[in-house]
Structures are given as C-alpha cells and as structure tokens.
C-alpha cells in the first residue's frame, strides 16, 4: 500500500479534504482554556478483534465505536485531553477543535501506515479502522468518565446533581465530523449495522425517528447518563447498565428477541426501584428527542437537555407518588438550586388553575402534599405556585409578585384565624390595612381582599397529611397494651398548653355527665383571664377517665368527639374541686383548680349536682393521679412549682393512699418550716411576692392531699366502686343533705389497672367495638 504524508493545516469549515488509505498518529494540542487532563479517564484498545478494556470495569466490551456527525458534547471539568491523548487521523487536512478561536498552524505527522499506536495500544493487522481518531478518543474519555460516575435515580442522589450550576462546571464545544469520516461511517458494514435505522440523517444530525425499529431497538440502549449533566449521547454498540458494566449491543442482524432480552437485563440489573422506573420511562421520552445543529442557541443544548429530561421524569413521579411519599414533595421543591427549580416548574405544570380564584387554586395546590419545612423553603414552594397561577391566568391584572404577596398573606391569615394562638383574631380591616401598597406600590382591590378574607374565615386552608404524620396526629387511634386488655387511645390536646398532650383511653369509664355552665377565671400559672374571655358558656360536661369533656351537644355513646370538644377538654389529674364560697353572683357554683393552676367556675343546676360533681372529680383525681416528681434543685431563690405527671398511676389503692399520706407529711413539714421564717421589714416587693407564692402553693397542696386521703380512705372502707354508696357514706360522715344519694349519672367507679368489683360501671362500648 502506497502511503503519502500530507501536512495538517487548520482552516475554516468547508475546505476540501483528500482521501488516503493510511493513518498516522498525531498529537492533540491541549484546550486553550487550560483545562487539565483528568487522571484515570484513559482507555486502551488491544487485540485484533478491537477489544476495549475500560478502566474501572472488569468486563471487556467489544464492538466498533462509530461517532455520529453533528454531535454536541458537554464535558465536565477535567475531561480535556492530556499529552497522552493522541489522535489517529488520515494524511489529510483537518481542523483541530478547541474551545477558543481557531488558529492556523502546521501539525507535523509521522508516517505509520501499518504499525499501531503504542500509546493507544492499537494494532493494525491490515483491516481498516473506520473510526475518526478525534471522535474515538473523546468517546473513550466519555465512556470512562461515565463508568466512574454514579447513576442518579433517587431523590437524594439528585441533590448531588444539582449542587453546582451547569454553566459553571462545563466546558462546551462542538465537534462535527469531517465529510470523509461521515462517508466512511455510512459505507462501512460495521457502522451500518451499529447505526440502525434513523440514527443518522443525511445532514449528520441525530435522527428523531430512532425508535424501536432500528437495530438497537429501544433508544434506552443509546442513553447514557453522565455523572454531572446527564447528557444524552449516541452510543452505537454499548448498552448502559446501572451497575456500571456494559453489554454488547446486537450486531448487524440483531432481532427483536435479543433487544427484549437485553432490555430485560437492563431493568433486572437495577438495584434501585426508582432507577428502574426511570429506565423504563426513557423509551417513550428519548425516542422523540431530536439532535441539535452545531452552534444551536437552544437553551437545552450542551447537556442541559438531559437535565431537563431528568427533572421532568422526577416531577412526574413526585406528582403520581411513584416511589415517593407526600412529605418528599415539599422537601424537593423547596430547595434553592437550579435542578429543584426545574423540577418545581415541571411539577406545577400538572396543575391547571385557569379560571380559579386565588384561594380556590391555593386549596387545590395544598391538597396535593403537606407544606412542610422551614419558612424559606415553604416560601420557595409558594413562589412556584404564584408563577404557575399567573401562567394559567394571563388576563389577571395582578403581577406575579402581587400574587405571591397575596398567597403568603392568606397563609398567615389562616394561621391567625384558625390557629391555637391566644388573643384577638385579625379583622378584615386589619387584613386590608396590612396589604396597603404591596401590589407593586399600589393597593389591592378592596373587594378582592374582602372576598379572600371571608373565604379563609369561613373555611380554613387544609392540606394533605402524610400517612406517617397521620399516625402522630392528635386524633389518630393507636393500640396500646395496658394491663390485661387492649385499649384504644387518642392524643388529647390541652387547649391551655398545645405543647403538652396525654394519651387517654377512648373506652374509659364515664363517671358522670350533665349540664354545666363554665366561666374561665384564670389561665395557666394563675394569670388572670382577659375580660373578653370570661363569659359564661353552657356545655354538656362528661367526666370520662381523667378528662372532663365540655361538648356543645348532648352526650351520646355513639357520637365521636369533635375538634372543638378536644379543645375545651380539661384534665383533672392532681386537680381539686371545691365550693366557690367567695363567689356570690351565682348559686351552686364550684371552683376547679387544675394541675397547671388554671381556675374554672362551673354552675350546676342544683346543689346536689354541684356536690356530686365535686365528689367525683376529687375521687377520680385521688385514685388515678400519679405521684409527683421531686422538686427541682437550683441555686436560684425564685420559687418554681414542681412538675406534676399527667400519666395514670400504676399503684393500687392502698399504695396510692400511703403515697398521698407521705406527700402530705412532706408538704406539712415544708409549710411549717416556711412559716418559721416570716417576712422581714423592708423586704423587696419581688422577694415578698416569691414568699407569698410559695406559701400559697404549700397551703393548696396540703388541702388537696387532705381531700385525696379522706376520699380514698372512705372508698377503701366502703369496699365498692358504686359511687352512690360512696356518696351516701360521705354524707353520713359529714352530716350533709342525704339528697346526695339520688344522683343517676354513671353511678360506678372502676380502676383501669385492676378488676372491677361494682356491677354498675358504664363503659363506652361503641369505642371498644371500633
């Protein structure tokens, strides 16, 4: 074979090329932007069969690599060729592709027609190599980098993909193939077998019709995800496998059976469920993607198209909850990176807010997932919602910033009107005044603001609750092993302190129920209740377990507790009920002081009912209140009340009685010691207040334990859980009106931890059946 060496010159595109049968190695000059070669990205080709061994794998891959013309490559930092990246090229004029402007220079070559390149390990036993050296080298670099990369399939791994901006971490350049190499790729039988139908158009673009009719079958087999930008590359003979290995693609005559078998291997080799879903979806998505011309200004060019496709797939799976939970949606949409913004845009495209008012659109959006996370994360999610609402309603005169302002205002209004905060609720005039000049320097329409205010006031915003969060909610029923039986328990929220909740048995014994009129006299820690909340309100009271429920409707066994009933519920553990002798405006009034020192006044229909309520509340508290914890030890002189446990005691009645007696002796001793050090003259007002507070606490505790001991001793002496017998015994001892014996509401008392001796205990059978 005659060989001819031609000088290599750089010239503009479109210059004539000359054919020659010989190949000579040329050294590739480095990129002008100074990008260093990445270590460990080299690959070598050895053996007469064209066997390639890629670094990072143990499995050889065979088959020719044919580069497509017009291919746009996007490489991450560090993928530029080094000094050892030689390129095999014909003895013709060619153009060196660089990221900077091209400069014409002569590149000397050395004739090497039959010998292989020692650095690339290429042996030339006489058969021609149809691959362009420039493209083959870059394909080997890309394959090696892709093998070292990680397949991004899960929600967490996608976070890594979006850590850096695409524009900051990529060096983009275009490398269209020369007409000579294009002609060789079309004429070669190996290349034709690898290309299949529709993979290379007449102009060198990636075909848009490369569906399942080609030799390679599904476009899935030409889809290789990069570790940074998920570039979609045309890979003619290799099949991407999620675990990092490759399988040989079918040859020139691969059938449909082989294609299906290879695809099954792909899906079965994936270890992540979400990755399998992503691979199975890529057939329909990538088959319609068209290649871009060199120099295209499409914003999805140079690797961004792969990221956009990944964001679209993830958004679809988040919307349909395929492999994700509802709580994962807000966590992904609320992140502050470019990829999460792409995902949010694709996710919001599933919602159509056309023709909806802002409050209705917001309700629809919030029902899809729970809006969780920190304030800035939730604000980002609402920003995406506002943008989508403006896209669906282009005729709305309000700007996107104005819609976002109104959305945040509605969220705050919902919290103010329907939250557990104590204080005066926001009025409509205050809502309008708070939004003055926030519509791009102008005011919102008052009719619009009034409509939105009334909508939120009449119907609060509700969003979806995740299944895991539902188990932890205040109204979720769970099974709790207690004693010898299984009880249904719920989380009862104390309206005075929303941060403390206690499990209560729904099938607990009902000790008394009847009509009571309530007045709130003091809030937590004895603070005076504001005047606007001191009014008398009539309720139907139910003493069930250690909870006093105040219902607006009459008590029924088959009726479930509403949210309002739970808000008004009062826990009577460590509480003390007495006659309100210092209150003379109404008759038959009892005073209830709870463990957190809240004070309530209740008016009963008659004196007998008042005394019955006092007896049963105190008796339940005496039997079921757990022993108090020791007081905290501190160097501060400020007095602090000890924490009283809200759980049910595990002691029997005799042990409970001894515990109360020991506590009474301790409190009595502390009170005597406290009174041995009276106030000194000239004592500061703050110290005097601390002294009086401690004395008041010890006096109250002494009175409470005396009442507990008296009632519990009578109950043990009677030897029955029949509350009528206990009331009669107490009336005889105290010489009170015997009419106390004629109460007819739940006349029995039973312990949750021991056998019931009385036969008149009433149980909430409907709750136990559920």
Curated annotation (Swiss-Prot):
Residue ranges annotated as transmembrane are 619-636
Q: Which CDD domains match?
A: PH_EFA6 (cd13295), Sec7 (cd00171)
- Keyword set includes Transmembrane: yes
Q: Which processes are annotated in GO (biological process)?
A: regulation of ARF protein signal transduction
Q: In which compartments does the protein localize?
A: Cell membrane; Cell projection, Ruffle membrane; Cleavage furrow
Q: Which UniProt keywords apply?
A: Cell membrane, Cell projection, Coiled coil, Membrane, Phosphoprotein, Transmembrane, Transmembrane helix
Record's compositionally biased regions (Low complexity): 216-234, 285-296
The PH domain is annotated at 509-622
Region: Disordered; residue ranges are: 1-65, 181-304, 738-770
Protein's UniProt name: PH and SEC7 domain-containing protein 2
Q: Which gene encodes it?
A: Psd2
């Amino acid at each position: 074979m005659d060989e001819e060496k031609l000088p290599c010159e750089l010239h503009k595109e479109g210059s004539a090329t000359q054919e020659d049968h010989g190949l000579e190695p040329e050294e590739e000059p480095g990129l002008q932007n100074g990008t260093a070669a990445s270590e460990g990205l080299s690959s070598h080709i050895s053996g007469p069969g064209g066997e390639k061994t890629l670094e990072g794998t143990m499995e050889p891959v065979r088959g020719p690599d044919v580069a497509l013309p017009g291919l746009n490559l996007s490489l991450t930092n560090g993928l530029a060729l080094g000094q050892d990246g030689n390129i095999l090229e014909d003895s013709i004029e060619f153009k060196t592709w660089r990221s900077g402007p091209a400069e014409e220079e002569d590149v000397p070559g050395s004739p090497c027609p039959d010998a292989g390149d020692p650095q690339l390990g290429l042996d030339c036993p006489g058969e021609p190599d149809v691959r362009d050296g420039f493209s083959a080298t870059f394909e080997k670099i890309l394959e090696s980098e892709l093998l070292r990369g990680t397949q991004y399939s899960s929600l967490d791994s996608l976070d890594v993909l979006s850590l850096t901006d695409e524009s900051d971490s990529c060096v983009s350049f275009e490398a269209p193939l020369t007409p000579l190499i294009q002609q060789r790729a079309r004429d070669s039988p190996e290349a034709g077998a690898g290309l299949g139908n529709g993979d290379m158009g007449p102009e060198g673009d990636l075909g848009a019709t490369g569906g399942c009719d080609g030799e390679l079958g599904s476009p899935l087999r030409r889809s290789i995800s990069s570790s940074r930008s998920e570039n979609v590359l045309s890979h003619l003979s290799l099949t991407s496998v999620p675990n990092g290995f490759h399988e040989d693609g079918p040859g020139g005559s691969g059938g449909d059976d082989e294609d299906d078998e290879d695809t099954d291997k792909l899906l079965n080799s994936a270890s992540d469920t979400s990755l399998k879903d992503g691979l199975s979806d890529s057939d329909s998505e990538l088959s319609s993607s068209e290649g871009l011309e060199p120099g295209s200004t499409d914003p999805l060019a140079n690797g961004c198209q792969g990221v956009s496709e990944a964001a679209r797939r993830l958004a679809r799976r988040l919307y349909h909850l395929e492999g994700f939970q509802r709580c994962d949606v807000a966590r992904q949409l609320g992140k502050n990176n470019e990829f999460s913004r792409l995902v949010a845009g694709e996710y919001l495209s599933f919602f159509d807010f056309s023709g909806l008012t802002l409050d209705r659109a917001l309700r629809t959006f919030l029902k899809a997932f729970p809006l969780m996370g920190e304030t800035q994360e939730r604000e980002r999610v609402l920003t995406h919602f506002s943008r989508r609402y403006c896209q669906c309603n282009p005729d709305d005169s309000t700007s996107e910033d104005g819609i976002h302002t109104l959305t945040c205002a509605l969220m705050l209004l919902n919290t103010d009107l329907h939250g557990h905060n104590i204080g005066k609720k926001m009025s409509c005039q205050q809502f309008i005044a708070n939004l003055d000049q926030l519509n791009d320097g102008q005011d919102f329409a008052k009719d619009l603001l009034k409509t939105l205010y009334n909508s939120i006031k009449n119907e609060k915003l509700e969003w979806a609750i995740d299944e895991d969060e539902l188990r932890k909610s205040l109204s979720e029923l769970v099974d709790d092993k207690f004693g010898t039986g299984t009880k249904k328990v719920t989380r009862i929220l104390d309206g005075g302190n929303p941060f403390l909740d206690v499990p209560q048995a729904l099938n607990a014994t009902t000790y008394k129920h009847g009509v009571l009129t309530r007045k709130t006299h003091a809030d937590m820690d004895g603070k005076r209740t504001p005047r606007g909340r001191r009014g008398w309100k009539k309720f139907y009271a139910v003493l069930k377990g250690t909870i006093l429920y105040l219902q607006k409707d009459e008590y029924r066994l088959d009726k479930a507790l509403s949210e309002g009933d739970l808000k008004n519920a009062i826990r009577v553990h460590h509480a003390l009920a007495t006659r309100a002798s210092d209150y003379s405006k109404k008759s038959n009034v009892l005073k209830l002081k709870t463990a957190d020192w809240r004070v309530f006044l209740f008016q009963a229909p008659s004196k007998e009912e008042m005394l019955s309520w006092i007896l049963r509340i105190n008796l339940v508290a005496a039997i079921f209140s757990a022993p108090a914890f020791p007081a905290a030890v501190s160097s501060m002189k400020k007095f602090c009340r000890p924490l009283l446990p809200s759980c049910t005691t595990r002691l029997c009645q005799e042990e409970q009685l001894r515990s109360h007696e020991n506590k009474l002796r301790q409190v009595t001793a502390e009170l005597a010691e406290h009174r041995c050090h009276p106030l000194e003259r000239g004592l500061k007002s703050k110290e005097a207040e601390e002294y009086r507070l401690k004395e008041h606490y010890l006096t109250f505790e002494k009175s409470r334990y005396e009442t507990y001991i008296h009632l519990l001793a009578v109950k043990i002496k009677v030897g029955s859980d029949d509350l009528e017998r206990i009331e009669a015994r107490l009336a005889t001892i105290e010489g009170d009106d015997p009419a106390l014996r004629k109460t007819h509401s739940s006349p029995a008392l039973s312990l949750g931890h021991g056998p019931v001796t009385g036969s008149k205990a009433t149980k909430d059978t409907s709750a136990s059946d559920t």
